[in-house]
Amino acid sequence: MSPEALSELISSIAHNLVAAGQAGTLTDDLIPPVDKLAVMRPKDRAHGDWASNIAMQLAKKAGMKPRDLAEPFAAALAEADGIAKVEVAGPGFINITLDSASAAAVVDTVLAAGAVTDTDKHLNKVNEYGRNAHLGGQTLNLEFVSANPTGPIHIGGTRWAAVGDAMARVLEANGAKVVREYYFNDHGEQINRFAKSLVAAWAEANNLGDAGYQTETPCDGYKGAYINEIAARVQAEAESDGVDLTALAHQDQGLNDDGEPLGEADTEVREEFRKRAVPMMFDEIQKSMKDFRVNFDVWFHENSLYADGKVDAAIEELKSRGDIFDKDGATWFESTKHGDDKDRVIIKSNGEFAYFAADIAYYWDKRHRAENPADVAIYMLGADHHGYIGRMMAMCAAFGDEPGKNMQILIGQLVNVMKDGKPVRMSKRAGNVVTIDDLVSVVGVDAARYSLARSDYNQNFDIDLALLASHTNDNPVYYVQYAHARSKNVDRNAAVAGISYEGADLALLDTEADGEVLAALAQFPSVLATAADDRQPHKVARYLEELAATYHKWYNVERVVPMVLTDPETRGDDEARKALEIAKNPEPARAAARLKLNDAVQQVIANGLDLLGVTAPEKM
């Protein structure tokens, strides 16, 4: 019996007690929904397999003492199929012990779940166990990473790549249609600074400083070897196309009042660099994401909002709703009407659009586009965007939507890359930062994705490079992957020994170690549902680590495949000791049951790792 089935049973009993007049003043409408009646795993196994606090939840509403209300609950539970014992403990806890067959039923449930149909989206051989449809019918637009196209993806963006894709997988496993979207900021001042930086690098590489050209990187510009690389690529591409950048620069250069060069190339050459370099960065970012196993459904270009008139249209929509006013020569969004701390300029007094104007148009587009309009627009933003939440939620409300429902904003905290307890700066190409490609080159995609997804994105996080590169149980991804590989090795040994679980009697899974593994397997569906509802995919990773720990302990305590004297795993050369080891061998029927349990663990680990975008290895 699964925890979900127990919760449903408890809910049914609550309604039956109301009908029978055994629940005091409690009425049906005061009974919480099933998902609020979750059972818990007792820390002390002497207290049973599962515990419920239903009596304490409802005692006040029933006008009864918790223990008095717990007694009829316990009596009804004791009559249910699959339950061996029920006890009322403490102030009103109900401790439930399942019979061995009922507890072991989860093994059949896991292995009988159908294979997923969209196999091309999965890394591992996954099945439907744990997946549900409670978010079915919803289209969720999940925008993440969205780093400016002015350099490689840094470690903060890498965290969002790992967390965002894991979140998308978790939401899809709960029935939602998820649109993974990357917002490509190819408009605005940061692109101008990028182009200026490239022009300066080009001028320096071509020794144009003596001619008065600006060769120093602008104080607000971008630095790093990648700037020099891209500048050289732009020059080579331009020359291949018959464009003379030096001639353009001379055309732009101009002279000051003394007849000397102004020292900074202007619009023509800068535009040439912009239009060639931005697509180059776009291609590089796309490749980095693909190599990191993140496949976006939509790459949305900010420039298109202006080119297609969507910014003007969105402002007109807000104007029609009475939320736009003019003041001091500028156009303002009256966001204070909707909870913001101050009103926001959207068109400056010089006629230029403020950055927020594009955000307004972008949200409106997400909600009303022809293909896959979003029921919920989820934004995953960095810690430096915390002050942006108020205006975004105000804009959502101004469009008649519900903040927190139609728009959700998740803020991620900082990541520090450490080695031997000290911060690491390992990128020669991008200057004083760590990039996605740097991290992957050191620890690999699996370790990078798992480590970044296993921590709550609301908290600062330190990555230990030495730990992630190690093959020890202290390395979380190794620990979980090794559990899967170990289970595969059990299968290989069982095949050699001629053991099959066909027709296995799962009631023989009756030891304490067996029970711990069974309970862990049963919790996977609720973990997956909670991870989706809370928008916290790290809960899947933490569950996998607990399952792996339970499995490794079980493996060391309960033998699955019988040992023979010639087994390489036989310990030592002492024949008496070997005989003692062999005496621990399970009888064939119990070995078959344990093999089936082994394969159920294997399946759940494969399912869970797939949700994190991490492979489940056959061998390690």
From Swiss-Prot:
Self-association and partners: Monomer.
Name of the protein in its database record: Arginine--tRNA ligase
Any one of the GO BP annotations: arginyl-tRNA aminoacylation
Naturally occurring in which organism (per UniProt): Bifidobacterium longum subsp. infantis (strain ATCC 15697 / DSM 20088 / JCM 1222 / NCTC 11817 / S12)
GO molecular function: arginine-tRNA ligase activity; ATP binding
Protein family according to the UniProt entry: Belongs to the class-I aminoacyl-tRNA synthetase family.
Superkingdom of the source species: Bacteria
GO CC annotations, alphabetized: cytoplasm
Subcellular location: Cytoplasm
